[in-house]
Amino acid sequence: MSVIRPSPIPIPRCRSQVLHRRLYSIQLIQRRRRRWNPRSEVEDTAIESTARSPEAAGGKMVVELVGAFNEVTERMNSVWLSTSSSRLLFKALKLSIPILQSLPLASDGRSPLSKALSLSIILADLQMDAEVISASILSEVVDANAISIYEVRDHIGTGTAHLLHEIFRVKNIPFKVDVLDDETAASLRKFYLTYYDIRAVIMDLVSKLDEMRHLDHLPRYRQQILSLEVLKIYSPLAHAVGANHLSLELEDISFRYLFPCSYIYLDSWLRGHENGSKPLIDVYKEQLHRSLKDDLVLAEMVNDVYIKGRYKSRYSMMKKLLRDGRKPEEVNDVLGLRVILMPNSVVNDVEVGEKACYRTSEIIRSLWKEIPHRTKDYIARPKENGYRSLHMAVDVSDSDQIRPLMEIQIRTMDMDGSANAGTASHSLYKGGLTDPKEAKRLKAIMLAAADLAAIRLKDISSNKHQSFKTTTNQRDRVFCLLDKNGDGMISIEELMEVMEELGAPGEDAEEMMQLLDSNSDGSLSSDEFDTFQKQVEFMRKWEDRDNEYKSLLDEKLHDLPHQDTTGLIQLYNKELEDRLSTH
């Protein structure tokens, strides 16, 4: 494949460099352990072979490849993780990672690889399929002119290339924010959904969300222009395709940049609903979860209970305050819980599930005061679109403080799945598409696109490549993708092939094989590769923790300089920044 690549530019503090420092640190710790406990030497042999950091470029890329694949697939719905879809995602990552690592940092300070992985994670959380996620990753490479759509078609597949073509069509829609009145914005949203692949629209929405999360480097005027575009076009569009959480986050970020003072006021008030250092919604969530788990009657009907908590979005709250003239404490549904029950009966799970929902409502009434006129029984009387759930509102005020009402939704796992699946058709109206026939047609387009992707990625059984079982975990999946001949071992030839696909010399494969092959038999077993992946997972978690601690330290240190009369805090602050910037 002929790929035009820019001159390699060193990327400071890239993830793979940090990962390999962690590997070396693990090795030192294990050596110290061995001095105190010689008997641990045999037990640590396999891990030590992995802990020796493979400093070659190929080894670093394999670490990045395995880590990225696992991070994305563990968030995906198992329905999408067939053999074909896993291979597709793996091929896209192999093609993209070497190129993305060689590109310069973006204007927001992130590496292109970091941005590509952020997009893929959002899409995985939205339960998009491997083809959409692969196209999203590759779009960053194509956008940098490092590879063409035609090359993607030849090396990845026609379906992915088509999606890339669609996403760039969507990105190039011309419009100006100064003419985006309500009618024009509604027409533009309808144009999006009528003339473009719905999956490309979702990819564009995710790209816009990622952009909105990193606006601080832009001038104030540009931040406001983008935020207005999001409120007029992208947030309602996200609602129209059923991505409600994405829509709410887009609204809140836009609100923060357009109306910073109002946002701070509402945000401070919402955060004031805390019990000590813990958000109030978490307190209620834990209280309800304990009560449900302790109830013996409910325990006979359900295997498990899940509870989700949420605060009303800042933008949604602002609209209610301005529209109705209410005070913040008079806004209902600021707090919300959703109880999802998993019935333990297979034969009569519908009947048992309904009884469990009503039993849950009785337990809730024993904890808080119910507001009767706010109760809506959509289980006994489902909505026209088939929606079934039990809605309640309760008063959680105590003797010390009056609090807003809390809304609680109660449903079974099946009811929740049906509600989410039906979100798209219902939200097409809220997204500004008020024609029922048009909404029904657009829903059919969305379902057809999903069916087409499922058919395209359907597994074809063969003797050479076995389908993944539903119980296959993330580590086994990567091992099977590298074990191309299916003999249960990764040979030096198979490892070398991956290295070459990543653009690294074959010698790196030999070095990495020596480091990972603990029994020196010339190949990697699933256990040896599993040890390697555990190290990768361990290091990625510690890198995230390190960044978290750095932020906390920065916050603490920046709050204290005015109290420092000796200059020691400023000195320590500078030394800390210098150390962190060199590691």
From Swiss-Prot:
It is found in: Plastid, Chloroplast. Residues 112-212 form the HD domain. Expressed in shoots, cotyledons, rosette and cauline leaves, stems, sepals, pistils and siliques. Its EC number is 2.7.6.5. Ca(2+) 1 binds at D483, N485, D487, M489, E494. The record marks G309 as: Required for ppGpp synthetase activity. It catalyses: GTP + ATP = guanosine 3'-diphosphate 5'-triphosphate + AMP. Keywords: ATP-binding, Calcium, Chloroplast, GTP-binding, Kinase, Metal-binding, Nucleotide-binding, Plastid, Repeat, Stress response, Transferase, Transit peptide. Residues 470-505, 507-539 form the EF-hand domain. The keyword Lipid metabolism does not apply. Induction: Circadian-regulation with a peak at midnight. GO terms for biological process: guanosine tetraphosphate metabolic process. It comes from the Eukaryota. Activated by calcium. Coiled coil: none annotated. One of its GO terms (cellular component) is chloroplast. GO terms for molecular function: ATP binding; calcium ion binding; GTP binding; GTP diphosphokinase activity; kinase activity. It is an enzyme of class 2 (transferase). CDD domains: NT_Rel-Spo_like (cd05399). Possesses calcium-dependent ppGpp (guanosine 3'-diphosphate 5'-diphosphate) synthetase activity in vitro and is able to functionally complement E.coli relA mutants. Plays an important role in the timing adjustment of pistil and pollen maturation required for successful pollination. May be involved in a rapid plant ppGpp-mediated response to pathogens and other stresses. Belongs to the RelA/SpoT family. The calcium-binding sites of the 2 EF-hand domains are required for enzyme activity. Plants silencing CRSH have abnormally small siliques with few seeds, due to altered timing of pistil and pollen maturation and unsuccessful pollination. This is Probable GTP diphosphokinase CRSH, chloroplastic. It comes from Arabidopsis thaliana. The lineage of its organism: Eukaryota, Viridiplantae, Streptophyta, Embryophyta, Tracheophyta.
